[in-house]
Amino acid sequence: MSFEVLEQLEARVQSAVDGITLLKMELDELRAQNQQLKEENQHLRNEHQAWQERLRSLLGKMDQMNSEG
């Protein structure tokens, strides 16, 4: 192989390595973002459940008042 071919091969390999490195960085960022969204989703689900329980309690009290009155 000539020196020129080896240089071209080295450039292609370096380009591939750079691309893989960038993709790994992007993957790490997306994983972190995904984890953050999972935590936010769980928080919102808990909040939603709390509101549902409050609403059920209020509706139960209203039903109780209607049946007594």
UniProtKB/Swiss-Prot annotation:
Residues 6-68 form a coiled coil. GO terms for cellular component: cytoplasm. It is found in: Cytoplasm. The keyword Zinc-finger does not apply. It holds the Pfam family ZapB. HAMAP family: ZapB (MF_01196). This is Cell division protein ZapB. It comes from Tolumonas auensis (strain DSM 9187 / NBRC 110442 / TA 4). The gene is zapB.
